[in-house]
Amino acid sequence: NTPAFNMAVPTPGEAQTIYLWEEGKMPCPREYSSSWNDPEDFKPHMEYRPVKKGVEVKGAVMLCAGGAFVFRGNWGDTYPTADKLNELGYQCFVVQYRLRPFTQEEGALDLARAVRYVRYYADEYDIDPNDIAVVGYSAGGILCGEQVLNWKGDVTPAALDENYIPDTLDLVSADSAAIGHIYSFYGRLSVGSTDVEKFRQSNLPPTFYAYGTEDPFYHQFMANADAVREAGVSVEEHCYEGQPHGFGAGNKNSDWVPEFDRWLTDIYENN
C-alpha cells in the first residue's frame, strides 16, 4: 500500500506556510556543508497568499523567484506579483525551492510537490483542479520549465532518487494548465533550449513570455519562444522596448501582469 502523506491542512483565506516534505522523506538529501546557499535547517516550502476578500477566485498560480539558483529574489519578483494577482482573483503560492548545490531537477521536484498539494486541496482553495499555472522569473522560470518538461503528470521523485518512497500525494497529477516565463526560458542557467523535437514530444502547456530588449538574454528568449511555437505549442509573447533583466512584477514600461491575467483567464475559462 502507498503510504499516506502528512502535511499541513490548508487555511483558505488566511496566509500560510506549508512545508513540502516530511522530515527524512525529501528526495535526494545531501550532507550539509558551509558551501550551501541556504541555512542548514532550510526546508522547501511554499507561502500561500490568498485572493483578496470579496474577489471572485479564478484559479491558482505558483510563483518561483529568480536568483541564479544561489538566492530567491522574492521581494523583487514573487511578492509584488502575488499582490497584483491576488487582487485579480488568483490564489498565489510562492515556492521556496532548493538552491545550489541542489540541481534544477531537485528544485523542480519541490515545485511538482507544491502543484500536487494545491490540486489535492482544490476544493478548499475554491479552484478547479485543472486551473493551476506555474510562473518563474529568470532561474525560477528555468525551474518551472524543468518541471513541466520532465516532472509533470504521474512522474514521481523516485525517477531521480531511487531511495524515495512515493506517498499518496504522488498519485496526484503534477500537470500545469500554463507556464509563465518572466525574463526566462526553457533550458538551463544562461542557456535557452531550441530543441523543437523535445518541446513537441513534451506536450507543453500554453507558454507566456515577458522580457525586455535590454536583457542580455534577449535573443535567447526570442529563439526559445520561436522553437516552442514551432513545436505546436500556444505561445503568448511580450517584448518590452528598453527594459532590462529583472523588472519583477513590471513597471509602466513592462506592465506584463494585466496581459498575463487576460491570457490566463481565457485558458482557465476554456479548461
Task: Label each region the model flagged.
Residues 2-55, 104:
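N-terminal cap/lid segment of alpha/beta-hydrolase-fold proteins
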Residues 57-67:
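Short beta-strand element of the alpha/beta-hydrolase
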Residues 65-70, 213-214:
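Active-site glycine-rich loops that stabilize anionic/oxyanionic intermediates
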Residues 113-203:
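Primarily recognizes the serine-hydrolase "nucleophile elbow" in alpha/beta-hydrolase
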Residues 187-188, 213-219:
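Acidic catalytic loop of the alpha/beta-hydrolase fold
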Residues 225-271:
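C-terminal catalytic histidine-bearing segment of alpha/beta-hydrolase fold enzymes
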